A protein has these predicted regions:
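Polybasic low-complexity intrinsically disordered regions
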Residues: 1-106
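C-terminal domain-tail junction helix/linker
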Residues: 154-187
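Hydrophobic (often cysteine-bearing) scaffold residues that line and stabilize catalytic clefts
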Residues: 64, 124, 153, 157
Length: 187
């Protein structure tokens, strides 16, 4: 499972005057939140159980399909992405690397796959949305309180480590990996 999320650096109206990440950050658009932003975009690779296994950080104006190439070496087999990963050249590159990229198609595209398969894709894709939602709400991964890229990547790595530790504790206790409510109640 692969998806991206925005990381705001400054409010869009203040971005031209912002000195933080000048020359590194960019302007982008997040379709799921229907907002334009100035900052970075995080790209997360999650395994089937919901445990993050890969992450890359790009300027917001970099296409998420281009950022996915940074994580291609750790992907094998089936890869589920959202509609933002639809591009024939990208799909061919994935096929050449032994990766079967499956995405939901746009409304104006013909889908030859069985409807039951598409429903399974959509149901499994919710898992990465859940993980990104947890990282955003419980770990505030979308907030930038840093002034340089090293500290930002370090901060994000710590948050991903905390998420993975919570998943590990749940697996050790015989629970679903991304159900953190029971960990909070037990503390």
């Amino acid at each position: 499972l692969i998806d991206g999320f925005p990381i705001d650096v400054a409010v869009r109206t203040r971005a031209p005057r912002s000195k933080v990440f000048k020359g590194e950050a960019g302007y982008g658009y997040c379709a799921s939140k229907n907002k334009h932003f100035y900052g970075f975009q995080g790209h997360l690779l999650v395994e089937a159980r919901g445990i993050p296994v890969g992450f890359t950080l790009t300027a917001a104006n970099i296409d998420e399909r281009d950022a996915a190439y940074d994580m291609m070496d750790i992907i094998a087999g089936l890869l589920l992405g959202d509609k933002g990963y639809i591009r024939p050249e990208f799909k061919e590159d994935c096929r050449g690397l032994g990766i079967d990229l499956q995405t939901p198609l746009r409304k104006n595209m013909k889908d030859d796959r069985p409807k039951s398969f598409v429903k399974v894709i959509m149901r499994v894709r919710r898992r990465i949305e859940t993980v990104i939602g947890q990282l955003a709400e419980q770990f505030e991964i979308e907030r930038c309180r840093c002034r340089d890229r090293w500290h930002m990547t370090s901060r994000i790595a710590r948050k991903l480590l905390a998420h993975n530790m919570g998943s590990y504790l749940n697996i050790s206790a015989g629970k679903a990996p991304i159900q953190f409510e029971s960990l909070i109640a037990a503390a």
